[in-house]
Amino acid sequence: MASSEQAEQPNQPSSSPGSENVVPREPLIATAVKFLQNSRVRQSPLATRRAFLKKKGLTDEEIDLAFQQSGTASDEPSPVGPATPVVPVQPPHLISQPYSPGGSRWRDYGALAIILAGIAFGFHQLYKKYLLPLILGGREDRKQLERMAASLSELSGSVAQTVTQVQTTLASVQELLRQQQQKVQELAHELAAAKATTSTNWILESQNINELKSEINSLKGLLLNRRQFPPSPSAPKIPSWQIPVKSPSPSSPAAVNHHSSSDISPVSNESPSSSPGKDGHSPEGSTATYRLLGPQEEGEGVVDVKGQVRMEVQGEEEKREDEEGEEDEDDDVSHVDEEDVLGVQREDRRGGDGQINEQVEKLRRPEGASNESERD
């Protein structure tokens, strides 16, 4: 009874909408087929079976299909004994007392094997997709972590080496910078010392130049002072009374022309190169003026003309010797000028009586020489 009640319970929810559905319900039909194939159910009359199936919620079409599929539509119970009142027998539930012929068992075993294979396959896939990655993933993670730790240790070692190298390079660079700074300071000191020495040398050179300039100026002054005074005669002079006097020849045109211009008293014997404006010296002592007497003054006194000429020649020679050290070109010009002056003076002397005033001779000679000439 309990099994029949359990079979009725799952079929009750589907019995209510059974009459309304037009399409046959295959699960109910299959259950009815199994129910009809039961040996005990076959012994029951057909009407009882139909009534029981209708009670379970199957329609007439479904019941007919179930009878056709089960092959029990023509089964009728055979009468064994006398007619006895028919007692309705409650059919047992299919699951509680299944009909187990040989074919159905193998089908059940096959279905069970398929179900077990599906479950095993599901477990295998679950294990492969989820459990195995978790297990292997942990191992891979461990290996990856180990590899990462090894790489980190290598990196830390390389970083430490690079840091030490950088520190050594920085120390060497700092040392080089310090050396360069020392060299720069030394160069700066050397430059300062060189500047100081150059400045002192320049000051000393300027002082030496100033000293040389002062010495040159003093030498110039000495030379100029030397030229301001007439030189003393070195050669002895002939007395005036021993010098023969020649009368001027009337045929010389220079004497005639000079007699006409004998009233000109000053005559300069200096050359243009020895002029006071050119040399930059004072005209005192560097110029020589001569006063020649005309025909009116010839009778006033007798003068030694040759002595005067000798004095003039000596003075010109001394001047020429002084000027030879300075400029050679000026010497040549002075020679020409001196010869011209001497020629002119000789021509002037030819026109007179050969005597010049004694006072002019005293001015051109030193005191000792004038006294000697007077004694003679």
UniProtKB/Swiss-Prot annotation:
Name recorded for this polypeptide: Peroxisomal membrane protein PEX14
GO CC annotation terms, alphabetical: fibrillar center; peroxisomal importomer complex; peroxisomal membrane; peroxisome; protein-containing complex
Biological role stated in the UniProt entry: Component of the PEX13-PEX14 docking complex, a translocon channel that specifically mediates the import of peroxisomal cargo proteins bound to PEX5 receptor. The PEX13-PEX14 docking complex forms a large import pore which can be opened to a diameter of about 9 nm. Mechanistically, PEX5 receptor along with cargo proteins associates with the PEX14 subunit of the PEX13-PEX14 docking complex in the cytosol, leading to the insertion of the receptor into the organelle membrane with the concomitant translocation of the cargo into the peroxisome matrix.
Main location: membrane
Residue(s) carrying Phosphoserine: S232, S282, S334
TM segment ranges: 109-126
Biased composition (Low complexity): 244-276
